[in-house]
Amino acid sequence: MSTTATLDTVETRIADLVSTFVRLPQGVRLDESCEPILQATTHQAVTSSEGGKRLRALLALDAYRALGGDAGRERRDAMLDLSCAIEVFQTAALVHDDIIDDADLRRGKPAAHKALAGPGHDAALGVGLG
């Protein structure tokens, strides 16, 4: 598998995992007034996870292959999910860092806390995170 194909696979899987994670469980309903906030937060979670070099995920996948990783689909998929989880964790660390530093941009786009600023979002979001 080429690095480009792997990178595309990682990007797609991260978007799928993040979208699935922030989705409400079946049958759970929020008050209508919460819907715009949920949609904005879901969109921002996916947007914050886009981009980056994905070196951690690619290195994890390469190490798995180099160490004779099982070629079975189930194990490959589990390793892909693990490598994507590493990237999502890194994104969470970057979002935290941006809040602490009150950064305006991340990867050329508004930082998550800036993108979500406005009605329904408390400016004191990062208080106590230091």
Q: What label would you give each PLM region?
A:
Residues 1-85, 91, 95, 102-120:
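Conserved N-terminal diphosphate/IPP-binding helix and adjacent helical/loop segment
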Residues 119-130:
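Short, intrinsically disordered, charge-balanced linker/junction segments flanking boundaries
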